[in-house]
């Protein structure tokens, strides 16, 4: 999900594990730990767009990473607590170096099975490791410059720090797996993308009440009972809303299935997901032999049915000559084969991921789709780049989305 949500979740989890001992420091480190998996986006700085796409929500979002990174970071924070002296203490830099090497081996080694060239993996592993180690490094510098030293009774110790990082990190990919994007929980053993499709990648109803109670908790004494109560209220409200989204998912799946049967549309498979920023308006994509069928349903609709379906031609044969090319294989895997090919006005082909729907409710223009990639040949080589073009009527599109969410008669 979005960064603010993951920061909030990490802070709340950090408070549960170490709040009594560290107070707001636990929330800060929890927010940092909750952000760590998404530092895989740093790959965009050093590699091509398709490799970065494959790497996002991969090893850093895996159960393996949560299990192995936790003791590495737990050991590092434990050692940081124990260090005395200033920046000239060689033990500070030795421990940072050891932890950085261990993280690099975990990130790069765990990515060798991916469809990314080895040199690119080394570059990605390096930049992601630097991003992860930056926060302990910054903390080390600040503590050394300020001469901060905590007595042993205020130090969590290796086991507690490890437990802290495990829960703060693992909750990130588990939450991401509830969205449509897909999360590779089982890397490096499987590239399966877990996607439960029950909540949008950004949902303010989930995030803002949660954030409010975490902020309230942060203003209270670290050993006080009210602090724990408010933090747990935030966790409880967000968890209750998450259960509500699963209920909606089951309900909407049934409505789409019955609506397809009513229209006598024979399909091979279908998927449903909430539209952006809400859990009221849902979209569904169903696949038949040569076309996809797209429909929308709001929980506020007068009747429990999808009133109409739009047919979207597949045109998969247009990229058949490139079927064995790495970029096409990655895009097909990324989209779970819910894709259509569109010929743009400039003659180039565009690969559109249908799971994320349309900005305008239409599917016949290169600017309609939320997630598109331009395919072209340059100097005999296939080049794929993301399309960031948006319709001029984006504001109107959001208004139409809002009106549709309010229901139809």
Regions found by a protein language model. Name each.
Residues 1-254, 258-274:
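N-terminal membrane-targeting hydrophobic helices
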Residues 266-269, 276-409:
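Extracytosolic and intramembrane catalytic regions of membrane-associated proteins
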């Amino acid at each position: 999900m979005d960064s603010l949500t993951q920061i909030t979740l990490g802070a709340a989890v950090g408070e549960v594990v170490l709040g009594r001992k560290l107070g707001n420091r636990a929330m800060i480190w929890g927010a940092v730990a909750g952000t760590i998996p998404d530092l895989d986006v740093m790959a965009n700085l050093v590699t091509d767009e398709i490799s970065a796409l494959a790497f996002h929500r991969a090893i850093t979002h895996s159960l393996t990473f949560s299990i192995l990174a936790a003791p590495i970071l737990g050991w590092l924070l434990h050692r940081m607590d124990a260090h005395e002296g200033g920046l000239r203490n060689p033990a500070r830099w030795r421990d940072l170096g050891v932890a950085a090497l261990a993280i690099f081996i975990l990130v790069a080694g765990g990515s060798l099975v991916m469809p990314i060239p080895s040199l690119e993996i080394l570059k990605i592993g390096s930049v992601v490791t630097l991003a992860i180690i930056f926060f302990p490094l910054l903390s080390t510098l600040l503590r050394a410059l300020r001469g901060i030293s905590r007595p042993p009774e205020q130090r969590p110790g290796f086991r507690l720090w490890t437990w802290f990082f495990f829960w703060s990190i693992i909750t990130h990919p588990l939450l991401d797996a509830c969205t449509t994007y897909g999360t590779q929980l089982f890397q490096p053993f499987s590239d399966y993308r877990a996607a439960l499709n029950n909540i949008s990648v950004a949902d303010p109803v989930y995030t803002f009440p949660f954030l409010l109670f975490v902020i309230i908790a942060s203003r209270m004494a670290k050993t006080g009972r009210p602090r724990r109560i408010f933090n747990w209220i935030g966790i409880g409200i967000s968890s209750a809303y998450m259960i509500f989204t699963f209920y909606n998912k089951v309900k909407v799946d049934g409505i789409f299935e019955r609506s397809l049967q009513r229209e006598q549309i024979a399909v091979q498979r279908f998927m449903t997901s909430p539209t952006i920023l809400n859990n009221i308006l849902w979209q569904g994509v169903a696949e038949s032999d040569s076309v996809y069928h797209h429909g929308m349903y709001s929980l506020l609709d007068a009747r429990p049915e999808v009133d109409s379906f739009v047919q979207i031609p597949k045109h998969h044969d247009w990229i058949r000559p490139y079927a064995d090319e790495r970029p096409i294989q990655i895009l097909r895997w990324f989209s779970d084969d819910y894709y259509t090919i569109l010929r743009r006005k400039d003659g180039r082909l565009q690969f559109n991921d249908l799971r994320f729907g349309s900005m305008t409710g239409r599917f016949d223009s290169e600017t309609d789709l939320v997630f598109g990639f331009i395919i072209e040949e340059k100097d005999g080589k296939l080049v794929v780049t993301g399309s960031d073009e948006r319709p001029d009527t984006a504001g109107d599109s959001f208004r139409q989305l809002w009106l549709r969410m309010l229901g139809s008669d």
